[in-house]
Regions:
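ATP-dependent helicase/translocase motor core
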Residues: 1-200
C-alpha cells in the first residue's frame, strides 16, 4: 500500500479558470488531477477579509457549475485571510453557510498569534501537507444522508472536519497507538461544535 500511497499527486492551481466566461478561483487543490478543494484569498492591505471571500462565493460563484456543484465538484471551499479561515462543503449561492476552520484563540474565536507569519499559516503549513491532507480525504470526510418525512427528500451533507475535531481525533489516535486500548477519554468542545462526530 505504501507504493500506491506515494503515487498520489497533490497539486495546486493558482487563478484557476472554471468556466467559459473567464471566472477564476484563487486556488484549486487537486488530488491526482481531481478537484478536492477551492479557496478564495483576501488580504487586509486591500481592505478585504474572509467575509469578502464568503460574499464572493455567495454572489459571484455559480453553484451549478460542475466544479462547484455539491457532490459533483470540489469537496470543500475555503474563505481565507491572514487571521481567519472559514469553510463550507455545500455552495448554495446566497443560502450558503460557512463555518470556522480556526484553531481558537484564548478559549474563544479566531487564531493565536504566529510570530513566524500569518495566523492562518497552519492551513498550508500543516493541513494541506500531503500526509494530513490525504488522511483527511481518506478517513475524515464522509457523506451524511438523513431521512425526512415524505415527501421531503433526504437531507444531505458532506462532513469535513473542523480544526478542533481533526486535532482531537488525531491526538487520540496517536495516544492510543502509544499506550494501547482501554483508556477512557473526555472530548470537550463547545455546544454545537461537533462532539458527537468527533467521537464517532
Amino acid at each position: 500500500h505504501e507504493k500506491q500511497y506515494q503515487k498520489n499527486i497533490l497539486s495546486v492551481i493558482r487563478q484557476a479558470q472554471y468556466d467559459n466566461e473567464g471566472h477564476e478561483l484563487d486556488l484549486l487543490l487537486c488530488l491526482n488531477g481531481l478537484p478536492v478543494a477551492t479557496a478564495e484569498l483576501k488580504e487586509k492591505s486591500k481592505d478585504q477579509t474572509y467575509k469578502d471571500a464568503i460574499k464572493q462565493y455567495k454572489e459571484d460563484r455559480d453553484s451549478r457549475n460542475t466544479l462547484l456543484r455539491f457532490k459533483r465538484g470540489a469537496l470543500v471551499h475555503f474563505a481565507i485571510d491572514a487571521h481567519e479561515v472559514h469553510m463550507t462543503t455545500k455552495l448554495q449561492d446566497s443560502e450558503t453557510d460557512f463555518i470556522p476552520f480556526n484553531k481558537g484563540r484564548d478559549g474563544g474565536f479566531g487564531n493565536p498569534d504566529n510570530p513566524d507569519g500569518y495566523r492562518t499559516a497552519y492551513l498550508w503549513e500543516q493541513i494541506w501537507q500531503k500526509e494530513i491532507w490525504l488522511d483527511i480525504i481518506g478517513k475524515f470526510i464522509f457523506h451524511l444522508s438523513e431521512q425526512q418525512s415524505p415527501p421531503l427528500p433526504p437531507k444531505e451533507a458532506i462532513i469535513f472536519p473542523r480544526y478542533h475535531q481533526l486535532e482531537s481525533v488525531r491526538d487520540l489516535t496517536a495516544n492510543t497507538k502509544q499506550v494501547g486500548t482501554g483508556t477512557n477519554y473526555l472530548i470537550e468542545h463547545s455546544t454545537g461544535s461537533g462532539k458527537s462526530k468527533s467521537i464517532a
